[in-house]
Amino acid sequence: MPTHEIRHPLVRHKIGLMRRAEISTKSFRELAQEVGALLTYEASKDFNLGTEVVQGWAGPVEVEKLKGKKVTVVPILRAGLGMLDGVLSLIPAAKVSVVGQVRNEETLEAKTYLEKLVGELDQRLALIIDPMLATGGSMISTIDLLKKAGCSEIRALVLVAAPEGIAAVEKAHPDVHIYTAAIDERLNEKGYILPGLGDAGDRIFGTKQKS
């Protein structure tokens, strides 16, 4: 199954803290980074390793090192930026591609307004990051862009996912694995996840949430 709900106790605890209405912007932002790092740990478990001999303190020693495709992290603006530092804390050499998506609040369809992708995507593994996987429109559109640019290995990291969004992404891109900290109940009539986290972008950046 291409969707992985991470049940680690630390992940469950931190997502529980993020659900609280009274949590501060500072704490929400820090937790988004921390859960982003934990999701990265899970999503990278099958990365290839090679060996090399280095000079250690007591002489030559064989060590392991990452081997294979380089990584590009792809935050979906703006909320995806809230997870970026957490991902880069584990993969600091990764290059960052940026995709801006805006959702039509009436049709719930996603529209791309910004696309800044790194080069040689055919030789890179892409980690798309976005706190919320709701309808799946923004995620599908971003995956479409990456595949069109030549990227063939793509993984999605989200804090909370709705069943509707998971189904949409799996139908459109069955080869893309989704790593999520929680699978929630459903979407409401406005396309927001219930119980969800609220508007993740507003909660990360401290801007006013829509009623």
UniProtKB/Swiss-Prot annotation:
Positions that bind uracil: I193, G198, D199, A200
Domain of life: Bacteria
Pathway: Pyrimidine metabolism; UMP biosynthesis via salvage pathway; UMP from uracil: step 1/1
EC annotation from Swiss-Prot or TrEMBL: 2.4.2.9
HAMAP family: Upp_B
Family of the protein in this entry: Belongs to the UPRTase family.
Name of the featured protein: Uracil phosphoribosyltransferase
Gene expressing this chain: upp
